Amino acid sequence: MSTMHLLTFALLFSCSFARAACDPKIVNIGAVLSTRKHEQMFREAVNQANKRHGSWKIQLNATSVTHKPNAIQMALSVCEDLISSQVYAILVSHPPTPNDHFTPTPVSYTAGFYRIPVLGLTTRMSIYSDKSIHLSFLRTVPPYSHQSSVWFEMMRVYNWNHIILLVSDDHEGRAAQKRLETLLEERESKAEKVLQFDPGTKNVTALLMEARELEARVIILSASEDDAATVYRAAAMLNMTGSGYVWLVGEREISGNALRYAPDGIIGLQLINGKNESAHISDAVGVVAQAVHELLEKENITDPPRGCVGNTNIWKTGPLFKRVLMSSKYADGVTGRVEFNEDGDRKFANYSIMNLQNRKLVQVGIYNGTHVIPNDRKIIWPGGETEKPRGYQMSTRLKIVTIHQEPFVYVKPTMSDGTCKEEFTVNGDPVKKVICTGPNDTSPGSPRHTVPQCCYGFCIDLLIKLARTMNFTYEVHLVADGKFGTQERVNNSNKKEWNGMMGELLSGQADMIVAPLTINNERAQYIEFSKPFKYQGLTILVKKEIPRSTLDSFMQPFQSTLWLLVGLSVHVVAVMLYLLDRFSPFGRFKVNSEEEEEDALTLSSAMWFSWGVLLNSGIGEGAPRSFSARILGMVWAGFAMIIVASYTANLAAFLVLDRPEERITGINDPRLRNPSDKFIYATVKQSSVDIYFRRQVELSTMYRHMEKHNYESAAEAIQAVRDNKLHAFIWDSAVLEFEASQKCDLVTTGELFFRSGFGIGMRKDSPWKQNVSLSILKSHENGFMEDLDKTWVRYQECDSRSNAPATLTFENMAGVFMLVAGGIVAGIFLIFIEIAYKRHKDARRKQMQLAFAAVNVWRKNLQDRKSGRAEPDPKKKATFRAITSTLASSFKRRRSSKDTSTGGGRGALQNQKDTVLPRRAIEREEGQLQLCSRHRES
C-alpha cells in the first residue's frame, strides 16, 4: 500500500515540474454566429468533439461572438475576441436579418489576412469561391451556382435538349451560366439561347418576347428574389407560364417576394438542411476537430497569431491547415457526407425538388448528390398539365443553309423580274427551283453582296420532298464563306470554332444543312446527321488522255528504227538480186537455139520486184532468172509476209482497239504516295477530305504535299485540272463522276476509298432529326432517291466509249489518204519530167540524124570530086544547103534557149560541146563548096 502512495506522490511531483508535458494542448476554435442560442450549440458541439476523439493530447476550446451591426464592428470583434485568443479556425454564419449576404465578408477578410481558415455555415454566394479574394474561406454548403448540376441532371432525366438560359448579369448569374455551359459541353450540347438582363431592371418584356420566338420551351432562371419576381410578372403577361412551358429555378427564385409572383407548375430547388445552422455548426466542428488532430501529428507546427494590433505576420501554419481541412472527408455529418472541392465549396449536397401547386410548394423529388429521383405522379406542370412537356415547340419555318456544289445544288441568277427561268430535266419534267439568298461572287475582285438567286438540283428536290412530307416551310440561303465546315483556331489560341455550314448551324444561323455534307466522326461529335441520302466514297479526277490522230498514224505500229530497217532491207535485197542474177551464168538463156537470148535482170527490175513482194502488188515481169537469186526472193517473200502481218495486227491495236490509259491507278499509286513537284494533286481546303488526310498517319506525306496546293472550292479545282494546272483532284465520287460525265475531257480513275455518305445536318437538340431520318428511309424504299440519282447524278452528256465498239474515223486514216495524194502529186510531177526528157531526147536524136545526113552528103561530094566530076549535082547542092540551114537554125535555137535557162553557164557550154563535131564538119563542107564555086567561076 505504501508503494502505491509513493508512486502517486512521484507522479504528482513530476507533474508539478513538467505541467506542459502532462496537460493537453488547448486548441481554440472561434465562431461568429447569429444568436446566443447558436453559441450554446457551438459549445456543445465542441464538447461532443472532445468526447468523440477522446485524446488526452488535444482539447478543443470554443470561443464565439454574435454578429455585429456593421462590418467595422464585426472586424474589430474578430480581432479582439477571436484572433487574440489564438484561434485555429473561425466558423461564420449569416445574421438573422434577411438578404444580408455580405456579413461574412469582414470575417473572411480579417481572418484571411493572417491565413486563419474560415468555415462558412450558410453562405451560398458564389463570390466566396473566388480564392483571389477570399483566401482562406471554406463552407459546408454549396454555392447557388451548384444548382446548375441539378438542372442539368433534370434535363437528362426528362430528355430536354432545348433550353433557354435566363440569367442576371451579375456574379451569381454568370457563375451559374458558366457551370451549366460547361456541363452542356461535356454532353456535346448547348443552350439554344442565353439571355442576360441587368440586376434590378424593371422591364424584361423585350427579352421574354425574344425567348418566345425560339423553339425551346424549357426556361432556366437564375436571379435574385426581386429580379425573379419581375420576370414572373412579365412572363404571365406574355402567356409564357401556361401549357407547354417548363420553368426550372433555384432556391432564391422561390423564396420571399419571388414566391408571390411565381407561376403554378414551376420547378424549384431547396437545399436540404441549407438553413439549419445548428446542423452545419455540428458538421463544421467535426471537420475542424478531425483536421486539428491530423495537423498536430505533423512537425514544425506554429501557434496562430495573438491579436491584430501591431501584428502583420501571417500564420505560417495557416495554409497547411487549410489544405488539411480541404482534404478532409467527414462521413458522419448531420447534413450528410462533408467534402470540399478545390474552391473550398462542399462537393456533395442534397436538394429537395419543389413544385408550386396552388400557391404552395410541394416536394416532388430529391437530388442525392449525383442523381435526380422525381415523383412524376405528384408533379403538376404549368397549365395544370400532368404529362411531361416535350420542352420545345416545333417551328414550321426552318432556316436552311446549303452550298453551291453541282449536281446537288446549282446556283443561277434570277431573271430581271426576280423569278427563276423555267427549265426542264432530261425526263421532260420541269426543274424545281427555289429562291436562295447568298453572296454574289460572279465578278472576281468585286465586293460580295447578298442577293437573291435561283437554287435547284438533287438536294433542292430532296428539301421540297421533306417539306411536303413533314409539313414545314423554309427559307434557303447559301453559306457565307463557301465552306462545308471544319474547326479552326480562334486568334491563334487553343480554342477552336467551326466555320462554314457547320459553324452557321451550331451558332443558330441555320436550323438544317441540306447539302452534300459528308458524314464523319469529327462532325458527328457536334451535330446530328440524318440517315445517308447518298452513299459514296472518294475518288480521283484526272484529265483524259484523248489520243490525237496525226498524219503519220498509220506508221505508229512500228518504231522509226524498224521503219528504217525495213526500207534499207528493200533496197539491199534489190541490189543483191541484181548482183546474183548478173553474175550467175544462168541469169540469161534461150529456150532453143533459134530464139534470141533474153535480157538479164536490170537494177530497176530488181527494185520493182523487191517492193512488189513487200507490198503484195504482184510481179508481172522482171523476176530473177538464176536459182541463187530466186532463193533470196523466196526468203524475202517470207520476210515480207511476217512484216505485213505484224503491221496489220498492230495497226488494228492502235487504230481500232485504242483506249486512253489511266494516268494513275488509285490512292496507292507511287506518284501519290511519293509526291513530287512534277505531279500536283490537291483537294478542297477545310473539307471532310482535307480532314481525312490530316487524320490518317499513313497519308501524312500526301497531306503535306496537298496542303500547299488545296483549292477554295471544288469548282476551282476541277477547272484547274482541265487547264492542266492540276494533275489530279481528290474529292467525293458522286461529284467527280458527274463532272466526268458532263465534261468529256475528264475521267475518274482508281477504286473508291474512304466510303461514307451524304447526310442532312441538324443540331443535337433538333426536334426534326428523327422525322428527317424516317422520311429519308422511306424515300429510299419507294424509289424516290433512285429517281433523283437518275435525274441529276447519272445523267451523261459524254458518250461512253466502253459501251460502243470503237470505229475508225477519217482522222485515224488521214495519213494514208495523204500518202495516196502524195503519190498522185509525185506521179504528175514525174510525168512532166518524163515528157520534158523525152522531148529533149527526140530533139537531140533529130540533130544527130541531120548531122549524120550532112556528113554523108559531104562524103558523097568528096567522092564525086575525087571521081572527076567538075560540077556538083544541083539537087545534091540544094539538099546540102537545106540540111546546113536546118542545122544552123537548130543550133541557134538551142544556144539561145540554153543561154536563157542557164545564164550562159556551164550547161550551155556542155551542150555546145555535144554538137561541136557535126557543126565543124558542116562548116568545113560549106567552106570547101564556096572555094570550089569560086574556082569554077575563075
Curated annotation (Swiss-Prot):
Residues 581-602, 625-630, 834-938 are cytoplasmic. It is a multi-pass membrane protein. One of its GO terms (biological process) is positive regulation of excitatory postsynaptic potential. NMDA glutamate receptor activity is potentiated by Zn2(+) in a dose-dependent fashion. The potentiating effect of Zn2(+) is at submicromolar concentrations and its inhibitory action is at high micromolar to millimolar concentrations. Excitatory glycine receptors are inhibited by D-serine at 100uM. It catalyses: Ca(2+)(in) = Ca(2+)(out); Na(+)(in) = Na(+)(out); K(+)(in) = K(+)(out). InterPro entries: ANF_lig-bd_rcpt, Glu/Gly-bd, Iono_Glu_rcpt_met, Ionotropic_Glu_rcpt, Iontro_rcpt_C, NMDA1-like_ligand-bd, NMDA1-like_N, Peripla_BP_I. Residues 19-559, 648-812 are extracellular. It comes from the Eukaryota. CDD domains: PBP1_iGluR_NMDA_NR1, PBP2_iGluR_NMDA_Nr1. Its main location: membrane. The chain crosses the membrane at residues 560-580, 631-647, 813-833. Disulfide bonds join C79-C308, C420-C454, C436-C455, C744-C798. Residues 1-18 form the signal peptide. GO terms for cellular component: cell surface; cytoplasm; dendrite; dendrite membrane; dendritic branch; dendritic spine; endoplasmic reticulum; endoplasmic reticulum membrane. Glycine binds at P516, T518, R523, S688, D732. Component of N-methyl-D-aspartate (NMDA) receptors (NMDARs) that function as heterotetrameric, ligand-gated cation channels with high calcium permeability and voltage-dependent block by Mg(2+). NMDARs participate in synaptic plasticity for learning and memory formation by contributing to the long-term potentiation (LTP). Channel activation requires binding of the neurotransmitter L-glutamate to the GluN2 subunit, glycine or D-serine binding to the GluN1 subunit, plus membrane depolarization to eliminate channel inhibition by Mg(2+). This is Glutamate receptor ionotropic, NMDA 1. It comes from Rattus norvegicus. The lineage of its organism: Eukaryota, Metazoa, Chordata, Craniata, Vertebrata.
